């Protein structure tokens, strides 16, 4: 019996040691999950640069193509909100597997019954339902990270997550079609995305060995408790700190989504850029975020999550948003200046990385619900980023619109003073310092 206890203790110690093993904050026990996210998002992102244009080439007008994407975006927002709680109830691995299967089935339906038949209703239905998949896949993995990463290294772990996301959707997903479309065309490229989804999904299913991803709360919950847990994805906003963090997270990416509504035209019509030059500026910014997501994830654990969001995120974005307009307005298409503003913006927007760690830290007993609220805020940031620009430009110039975004980031700066977060690692250090004195 003692031998059994010793073996059990050794096994538990090995599990803890494995979970604590890291590389610059990346939990090695989840490394295949991070790789799965990058590959999966490559497949999901391959269509983003050309799908609306391709739908129009089939004979549909701009508004019809836009409606397909709008329905998709609405479903994505809903799925983003539900994904955290679903992962908590049914386990991250199960929800990721479900999402992977949904993506494959409805993408094939979108291609066969929608695009190939030029059936508008089927495009809306199939592509819309496919919108459930990617948020459930990636945000379930976020819940998995909160389960398996040490709390004092959570921002670093989230930085790696967003870096993998950027590599997938922002870099590979955007650049690969530029090579594949001339060879196999748009439909061939859309079919080829299934390869990346299949590889990413299978990696998540079979190569991530961490058992934390199989925790199933549903087995310990009644149906009433399950419904209450889903409801908590909204009622959790009664927590003042969560509500403030929710608003700050919405503010986070407003410029990232909003500037693309009008700056492409401003850069080409007013500042003397070609379309290719503008795209290179914006593409460079995304490449920079791969590295800055990692940098700020690690730095946040060292200098403090809220402090980083306050000064480098909110103030950084206020300054870099204005720079994105005024620097090229003064210099024209100067490569040094455009590289500088891409660097500034890429550094500032990634400084919000700790927000992914702040939400589950604020409500540690309901991490899934906390992640769901974070995801809802991310979806609203997307929606309101576009919406603010669209509304402002009806009444004001592009210059005034830029200032509106900058002022909102200053508002976010003020709000961070009302966001009280007990950062685990800093608590430990403070306690050690106090005891040593």
Regions flagged by a language model, labelled:
Residues 38, 120-136, 335-350:
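Hydrophobic core of transmembrane alpha-helices in multi-pass small-molecule transporters
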Residues 47-49, 241-282:
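Extracytoplasmic gate region of multi-pass secondary transporters
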Residues 80-91, 293-305, 393:
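Helix-to-loop junctions at the C-terminal end of transmembrane segments
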Residues 89-100, 302-315:
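Cytoplasmic membrane-interface "Motif A"-like loop-to-helix N-cap segments
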Residues 101-117, 315-331:
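C-terminal ends and interior cores of transmembrane alpha-helices
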């Amino acid at each position: 019996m003692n031998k059994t206890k010793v073996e059990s203790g050794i096994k538990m110690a090995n599990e803890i040691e494995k979970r604590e093993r890291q590389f610059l904050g990346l939990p090695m026990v989840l490394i295949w999950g991070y790789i799965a996210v990058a590959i999966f998002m490559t497949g999901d992102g391959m269509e983003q640069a050309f799908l609306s244009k391709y739908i129009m080439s089939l004979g549909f007008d701009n508004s019809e193509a836009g409606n397909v994407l709008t329905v998709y975006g609405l479903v994505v927002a809903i799925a983003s909100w539900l994904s955290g709680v679903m992962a908590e109830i049914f386990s991250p691995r199960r929800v990721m597997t479900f999402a992977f299967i949904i993506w494959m089935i409805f993408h094939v339906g979108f291609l066969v019954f929608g695009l190939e038949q030029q059936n508008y209703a089927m495009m809306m239905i199939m592509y819309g339902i496919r919108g459930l998949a990617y948020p459930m896949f990636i945000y379930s993995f976020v819940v998995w990270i909160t389960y398996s990463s040490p709390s004092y290294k959570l921002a670093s772990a989230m930085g790696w997550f967003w870096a993998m996301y950027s590599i997938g959707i922002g870099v590979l997903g955007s650049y690969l079609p530029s090579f594949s479309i001339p060879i196999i065309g748009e439909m061939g490229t859309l079919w080829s995305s299934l390869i990346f989804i299949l590889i990413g999904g299978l990696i998540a299913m079979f190569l991530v060995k961490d058992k934390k991803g199989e925790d199933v709360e549903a087995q310990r919950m009644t149906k009433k408790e399950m419904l209450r847990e889903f409801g908590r994805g909204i009622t959790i906003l009664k927590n003042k700190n969560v509500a403030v963090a929710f608003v700050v997270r919405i503010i986070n990416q407003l410029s990232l989504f909003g500037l693309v509504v009008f700056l492409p035209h401003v850069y080409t019509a007013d500042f003397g850029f070609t379309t290719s030059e503008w795209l290179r500026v914006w593409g460079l910014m995304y490449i920079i975020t791969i590295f800055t997501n990692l940098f700020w994830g690690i730095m946040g654990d060292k200098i403090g999550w809220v402090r980083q969001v306050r000064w480098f995120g909110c103030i950084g974005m206020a300054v870099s948003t204005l720079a994105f307009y005024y620097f090229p307005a003064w210099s024209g298409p100067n490569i040094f200046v455009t590289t500088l503003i891409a660097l500034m913006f890429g550094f500032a927007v990634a400084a919000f990385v700790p927000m992914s760690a702040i939400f589950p830290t604020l409500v540690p007993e309901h991490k899934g619900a906390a992640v769901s609220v974070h995801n809802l805020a991310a979806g609203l940031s997307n929606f309101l980023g576009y919406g603010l620009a669209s509304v402002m430009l009806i009444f004001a110039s592009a210059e005034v619109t830029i200032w509106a975004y900058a002022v909102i980031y200053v508002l976010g700066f003020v709000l961070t003073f009302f966001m009280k977060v007990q950062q685990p690692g800093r608590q430990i250090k403070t306690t050690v310092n106090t005891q040593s004195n």
